[in-house]
Amino acid sequence: MSGIPFPAIDPVAVELGPIVIRWYALAYLAGFLFGWWYCTRLARAIPGRPTPDDLSEFLTWAIVGVLLGGRLGFVLFYNLDYYIQHPLQALAIWSGGMSFHGGLTGIVAAILLYGWRHGFSPFALGDLVAVAGPVGLFLGRIANFVNGELWGRPAPDLPWAVIFPDPRAGGVPRHPSQLYEAALEGLVLFAVLAWLASKPAVRERTGTLSGTFLVGYGIARILGEVFREPDVQIGYLAFGVTMGQILSVPMVLIGLWILVRAPFGPVRTPAAAAAGR
């Protein structure tokens, strides 16, 4: 049995007395900042709203939606029994424990509320967020690897298997599934969405990019979970599937529905923007 020893990476990026900043927190910060920059860049190329000013205002909504939704999703989907017994711990977001599907629900709620409040289609905003989202996912998965958490299933004969230092990993070589997910959910999905967003006919058809993100992420997550060790407090569910796979199936179905309806939805052309559509 071989395996690559986990590199000696300190999960703490900066420590100044009582102030401790982890790479995981910096990954979130970098993801939000990149998302804001990239979305405003896209918004300038698409007529109508949301405008770059809208996106600057929406940034706060996005941060709140992702953090609250991500934490609530982790509490409800992954460790509900524990938090029923220790309810105050649900507020300790700094102690770790975030759910992508919860964060997605939170930002979708923020998109719907912001679009409704400002009088434009939430799909127009969702399309921009969808293109930038995979970069945040990539950074988050890299931070998971740096933290030595969410490791993969045992793979004693895999040449690139990693031996994670956490005693709960059992000292056996495992798939570096965080890196697989960083590639699939992050790099590959971003490349596809950025290419589609470069096509005026695609980016002006509201809903196409949102639907593609949901389908693409759902498939990538279902595949990535094949190599990822399930959360110990949940394990495998019915028929050997994981919670992450179950939560990803509705994403794919909703994404397909959005893609089917997108050709019949509004088009963000200069003429449509001038007409106030």
Swiss-Prot record:
Keyword field contains Cell membrane: yes
Binding-site residues, a 1,2-diacyl-sn-glycero-3-phospho-(1'-sn-glycerol): R141
Any Pfam family: LGT
Membrane topology: Multi-pass membrane protein
Pathway in which the depicted protein is active: Protein modification; lipoprotein biosynthesis (diacylglyceryl transfer)
The entry's keywords: Cell inner membrane, Cell membrane, Membrane, Transferase, Transmembrane, Transmembrane helix
Primary residence: membrane
Entry's Gene Ontology BP terms: lipoprotein biosynthetic process
Source domain of life: Bacteria
Keyword Nucleotidyltransferase: no
Disulfide pairings: none
Residue ranges crossing the lipid bilayer per the database entry: 16-36, 58-78, 93-113, 119-139, 182-202, 207-227, 239-259
Enzyme class: transferase
UniProt subcellular location: Cell inner membrane
GO molecular function (one): phosphatidylglycerol-prolipoprotein diacylglyceryl transferase activity
A GO CC term assigned to this protein in UniProt: plasma membrane
Segments forming a coiled coil: none
EC number per UniProt: 2.5.1.145
Its job: Catalyzes the transfer of the diacylglyceryl group from phosphatidylglycerol to the sulfhydryl group of the N-terminal cysteine of a prolipoprotein, the first step in the formation of mature lipoproteins.
UniProt similarity note: Belongs to the Lgt family.
Classification via HAMAP family: Lgt
UniProt-recorded name of the protein: Phosphatidylglycerol--prolipoprotein diacylglyceryl transferase
